[in-house]
Amino acid sequence: MKPSERRKARRLAVQAIYSWQLSGNNVADVEHEFLTEQELDGVDVAYFRELFAGAATKTAQLDEKLKPLLDRPLEEVSPVEKAILRLAVYELTFRKDVPYKVVINEAIELAKSFGAEDGHKFVNGILDKLVARN
């Protein structure tokens, strides 16, 4: 498996988490929608499924790790940045085989692509604090 396959899986997972957060649809329906309506060439589909389902079903646990690190209530964090942070916290917590530097770098790149102008700085700061605590 190439690193780019995981990068594409993360990109798709962030979009799915974002869609799930806003729509309120169940996880299985959102996953099905993404697997049938998105371009999946070069995507590690199994990794996408794990990241999306893991982040979506463990949201409360992930949010508890995030809340003490934030400079504002979680509800005030943009939905895009929240999706990126949930994905990254899931990987940092449950995928110990992925180096933390890779997870943080991937999250920063996702924030540059999808987030607000300085969203990547916010994401980087939060994840750096999380790694320092563990």
UniProtKB/Swiss-Prot annotation:
Gene that encodes it: nusB
Role description: Involved in transcription antitermination. Required for transcription of ribosomal RNA (rRNA) genes. Binds specifically to the boxA antiterminator sequence of the ribosomal RNA (rrn) operons.
SUPFAM superfamilies for the chain: NusB-like
Full protein name: Transcription antitermination protein NusB
A Pfam family this chain is assigned to: NusB
Species for this entry: Shewanella amazonensis (strain ATCC BAA-1098 / SB2B)
GO molecular function: RNA binding
Record GO biological process: DNA-templated transcription termination; transcription antitermination
Keywords: RNA-binding, Transcription, Transcription antitermination, Transcription regulation
Family membership noted in the UniProt record: Belongs to the NusB family.
Superkingdom of origin: Bacteria
A GO cellular component entry from the record: cytosol
